[in-house]
Amino acid sequence: MEAPASAQTPHPHEPISFGIDQILNSPDQDSAPAPRGPDGASYLGGPPGGRPGATYPSLPASFAGLGAPFEDAGSYSVNLSLAPAGVIRVPAHRPLPGAVPPPLPSALPAMPSVPTVSSLGGLNFPWMESSRRFVKDRFTAAAALTPFTVTRRIGHPYQNRTPPKRKKPRTSFSRVQICELEKRFHRQKYLASAERAALAKSLKMTDAQVKTWFQNRRTKWRRQTAEEREAERQQASRLMLQLQHDAFQKSLNDSIQPDPLCLHNSSLFALQNLQPWEEDSSKVPAVTSLV
């Protein structure tokens, strides 16, 4: 039994008075819904097939910088706009990785400029002025204490040292003066003030030159005397060692006189004639038994 045809035909849904469009106060209640893609998302740029889609009002002035960077963001155009109630419709497909939108300079608020080091260098504070004045006074006082500062050369570290004082040139004497000084020194090692002045006048020298020469000559004489005494002492030591060695060798080479007590005792006689340091044992007399 077939059902009547009127029962199979679906009835159109009546509009609900408390739907989303009524809540959002959308004036476009009777407009056709936007075409949707395979995944259920609506096309914002334009539906396939060339059919005109729903038109949306433009962005308000506060969102003017949001839509411009995304107009040419990929192979298809993306139209960011707001719904009548302020809802932003988002495309179902994300833009390609190569179409990354640039930063939004117009949408970002103006950040206050950060002070740099160069700008901070010109700032002056009271405590900075006092510190500078203290350092300046301190350096001024140090410079006043050392007015005669030695300037050092710039270069190798060994060249930065203070140059040494120049030595006085060595005074050279003539052969006649040296001979007269040596003769007087052999006769007299020390001179009095009057004797020194007379010798200096006779040799056409100054008192200081004669005094310095005698001081240096005495130092040389003491060193030579000490060296000679040391050489004599070493020579005497070597002589004593030689004499001791000769005496020891002579005592070894002398024949041992037999003791009368050992003649009647074979053991004592053998010990008396025993000489272990001798290499030739044939010289040792044979022990004869006297018993």
UniProtKB/Swiss-Prot annotation:
GO cellular component: chromatin; nucleoplasm; nucleus
Compartments reported by the entry: Nucleus
Keywords annotated in UniProt: Developmental protein, DNA-binding, Homeobox, Nucleus
Single annotated GO MF: DNA-binding transcription factor activity, RNA polymerase II-specific
GO biological process annotation, one example: neuron fate specification
Domain of life: Eukaryota
Region of interest called Disordered, as start-end residue ranges on this chain: 1-56
Gene3D superfamilies with a match to the protein in the record: Homeodomain-like
This protein's record includes keyword RNA-binding: no
Location of the DNA-binding region in this protein: 166-225
Pfam families named among the record's database cross-references: Homeodomain
Principal location listed in the UniProt entry: nucleus
InterPro entries: HD, HD_metazoa, Homeobox_CS, Homeodomain-like_sf, TLX1/2/3
Protein's UniProt keywords contain Nucleus: yes
PANTHER family (UniProt xref): IP01054P, T-CELL LEUKEMIA HOMEOBOX PROTEIN 3
Protein name from the UniProt record: T-cell leukemia homeobox protein 3
Organism: Homo sapiens (Human)
Lineage: Eukaryota, Metazoa, Chordata, Craniata, Vertebrata
